[in-house]
């Protein structure tokens, strides 16, 4: 990619549909006429991104300095999560407030060793900066492959190419063999996955309690929130003209929960509605050292019956970099999960509320998410009652 020390992966992608993840939801209000071109990221392929709207587009603006002074992404200290009922009750309340109002929060003192976090980021950077010939064997758009690498996963649906290369590792419930994982990532990927699964278990316990349910509810078979895990490494080269492209277009996540590790470059933004003028603005999510960023996905918003929020977010291109991040998606996986029915949870704190969504199988949800393409609406709108 341009701006990095490696050569671009100049391959012609096939048109096989990527079954996971489905295309991200993005705004269709300002579609450029430029047709995206695969892989090559020189300035001639860049188009004015649909995710940088004018002031007239949905009245969304970048957060101004005084707005940022009034708002920050919640940071939750998980120290003491396993000790004492009073501290745990405080943590449940903090998580509940974050997912109800913002949909995003960061966690510190989460128990994942700093060495594991830094080694995972370094491994992904090393892989992406290998010669194209070394990366070529992993190039795939086959959603059934447990290891795949490419640029622009929604290339044939998006109105503009994005400035990013991605390595997908589907690690659970059945992960790839060590030989399938690129050598640069092979040693650390399994250890990192194990740590993230443990952290995910803690988070789903807190979220279950935030719904007024027993702490194992979201992990149990009926919900299955912890069964599937995709570890997705993104590499964003420095862009010579960052105003002409996006690192990742605005979208929501087709997951139960996303746990993100990012380096210090920054660029992640979340769309948040400030109280004062009731207008949504893009707010920076800082690259807090040693922290994971956590956000609610569409599946969990449906299960929670709108008590938890899945919100739009994006990544800006930067003139510095590369930016490296690891997004860990807890999501449905496999044939058994495809037949599972997703429906609002109407027990616990939600017992008195009518359902806000129709029931649907996981397969129906994923197919709709993929087939609806980038029409500027949320997947959940189709199922809302």
PLM segments and residue spans:
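C-terminal flanking tails of non-heme Fe-dependent oxygenases
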Residues: 2-160, 164-166, 175-176, 181-385
């Amino acid at each position: 990619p341009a701006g990095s020390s490696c050569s671009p992966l100049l391959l012609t992608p096939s048109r096989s549909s990527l079954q996971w993840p489905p295309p991200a939801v993005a705004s269709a209000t300002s579609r450029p006429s430029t047709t995206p071109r695969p892989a090559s990221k020189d300035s001639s392929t860049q188009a004015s991104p649909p995710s940088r709207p004018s002031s007239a587009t949905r009245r969304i603006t970048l957060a101004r300095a005084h707005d940022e002074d009034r708002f920050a992404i919640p940071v939750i200290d998980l120290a003491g999560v396993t000790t004492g009922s009073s501290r745990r009750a405080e943590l449940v309340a903090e998580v509940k407030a974050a997912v109800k109002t913002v949909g995003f929060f960061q966690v510190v003192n989460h128990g994942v060793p700093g060495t594991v976090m830094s080694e995972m980021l370094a491994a992904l950077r090393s892989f992406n900066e290998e010669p194209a010939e070394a990366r070529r064997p992993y190039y795939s758009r086959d959603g059934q492959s447990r290891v795949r690498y490419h640029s622009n996963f929604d290339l044939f649906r998006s109105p503009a190419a994005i400035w990013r290369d991605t390595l997908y590792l589907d690690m659970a419930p059945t992960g790839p063999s060590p030989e399938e994982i690129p050598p640069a990532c092979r040693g650390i990927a399994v250890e990192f996955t194990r740590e993230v699964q443990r952290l995910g278990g803690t988070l789903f316990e807190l979220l279950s309690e935030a719904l007024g349910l027993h702490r194992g509810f979201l992990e149990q078979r009926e919900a299955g929130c912890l069964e599937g895990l995709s570890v997705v490494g993104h590499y964003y080269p420095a862009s010579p003209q960052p105003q002409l492209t996006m690192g990742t277009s605005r979208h929501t996540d087709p997951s139960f929960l996303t746990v993100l590790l990012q380096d210090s470059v920054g660029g992640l933004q979340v769309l948040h509605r400030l109280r004062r003028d009731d207008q949504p603005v893009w707010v920076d999510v800082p690259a807090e050292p040693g922290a994971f960023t956590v956000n609610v996905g569409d599946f969990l918003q449906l299960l929670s019956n709108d008590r938890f929020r899945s919100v739009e977010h994006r990544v800006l291109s930067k003139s510095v970099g590369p930016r490296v991040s690891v997004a860990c998606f807890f999501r449905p996986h496999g044939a058994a999960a495809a037949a599972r029915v997703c429906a609002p949870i109407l027990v616990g704190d939600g017992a008195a509320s009518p359902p806000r969504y129709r029931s649907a199988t996981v397969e129906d949800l994923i197919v709709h998410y993929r087939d609806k393409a980038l029409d500027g609406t949320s997947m959940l709108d189709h199922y809302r009652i």
